[in-house]
C-alpha cells in the first residue's frame, strides 16, 4: 500500500509518485543536459535560498538519491569547523560507500553552514520550521519550480539531479560500468536507459584531466 508521502522510482522509467489533491500523480523526470540551464537553476536557487542552492549543487555533483541526501547531518560532511571532508561516508547495505565531495560542493556547504550558523547535529537540509530535514515532496517542489522559473520545458524533479550527475559524468568520459555500480543497476543498458541515452546516440566525450 502506498502512503501519502511515498515516492517510488523505477530505474528504467523513473516515475515519482506523489499525493496531490486526493490522487496519485506519476511523473517521468529527465536529466538537465544543458550546462547553461544548470547554471540558470543554480543562479535562481542561490538568489532565493542558500539551502536550496546547496541541495541542487550537492545532488548534481554526487548523484545520491534524495532520501540519502536528506539523512545527512552537518557533522557527516565536516572534519572540523572550517574543513569539509573530501569524502562523505554513506552507509549502504551494511557497507560504507565513499562519496566524493568536489570543490564546488565543499565551497557551497561551507558558505551555507556558516551563513545559517548550523551546528553539527543539524540536518544539512534542515526545515526552516522544525529540526527535521525537509521532506521529499518539498525537495521535489524546490527543484521542479526552479526549473520552471528559468524556463526549462522538460520534466524536472529531484531525481533529475541524480540523472544530471550521471549524464555529465558519462559525457566527460566516466565508464558506464562505473556509473552502473554507482547507481546499483544490474546492467550497463539499464544505466543508459536511466540516463536517457540511446545506444545509437552519439555523445561527444570531453575527457579533461584538469592538470
What are these regions (language model features)?
Residues 3-211:
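Conserved catalytic core of the tyrosine transesterase superfamily
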Amino acid at each position: 500500500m502506498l502512503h501519502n508521502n511515498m515516492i517510488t522510482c523505477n530505474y528504467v522509467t523513473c516515475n515519482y509518485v506523489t499525493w496531490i489533491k486526493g490522487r496519485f500523480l506519476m511523473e517521468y523526470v529527465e536529466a538537465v543536459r544543458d550546462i547553461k540551464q544548470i547554471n540558470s537553476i543554480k543562479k535562481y536557487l542561490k538568489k532565493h535560498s542558500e539551502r536550496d542552492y546547496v541541495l541542487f549543487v550537492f545532488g548534481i555533483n554526487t548523484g545520491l538519491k534524495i532520501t540519502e541526501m536528506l539523512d545527512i547531518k552537518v557533522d557527516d560532511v565536516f572534519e572540523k569547523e572550517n574543513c569539509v571532508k573530501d569524502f562523505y561516508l554513506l552507509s549502504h547495505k551494511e557497507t560504507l560507500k565513499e562519496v566524493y565531495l568536489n570543490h564546488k560542493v565543499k565551497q557551497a556547504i561551507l558558505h551555507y553552514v556558516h551563513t545559517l550558523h548550523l551546528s553539527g547535529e543539524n540536518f544539512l537540509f534542515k526545515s526552516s520550521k522544525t529540526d527535521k530535514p525537509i521532506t521529499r515532496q518539498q525537495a521535489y517542489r524546490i527543484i521542479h519550480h526552479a526549473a520552471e522559473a528559468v524556463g526549462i520545458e522538460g520534466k524536472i524533479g529531484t531525481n533529475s539531479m541524480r540523472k544530471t550527475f550521471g549524464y555529465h559524468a558519462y559525457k566527460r568520459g566516466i565508464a558506464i560500468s562505473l556509473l552502473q555500480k554507482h547507481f546499483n543497476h544490474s546492467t550497463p543498458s539499464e544505466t543508459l536507459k536511466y540516463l536517457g541515452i540511446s545506444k545509437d546516440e552519439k555523445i561527444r566525450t570531453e575527457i579533461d584531466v584538469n592538470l
